[in-house]
């Protein structure tokens, strides 16, 4: 019986006091700043999108669901969960974008390219 109590006490102590080293902290932000390239018009623009609101820019409708910044003590990075629609094709993108690795998961289609710049 005493062994079980000691074992339980040790588990509780180490379970509470030991913190994994891989803990990531993120700062939730209110806006996503994205760069949009309109290939047909040959222009790029930087647009600030509020979270959870449909924002229409040219032929695109963008909705940023979540935007976060990495811990300020780590290398600065930003992540956004973005949904992009066109009136003709419906949803053309839904997923996470990573600012430090723009080639990992950007929107690249015939008419537009979209990249994350930062979160504010």
Q: For the regions a protein language model found, what residue spans apply to each?
A:
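N- and C-terminal low-complexity/disordered segments
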Residues: 2-4, 21-120
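Bacterial N-terminal signal peptides
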Residues: 9-17
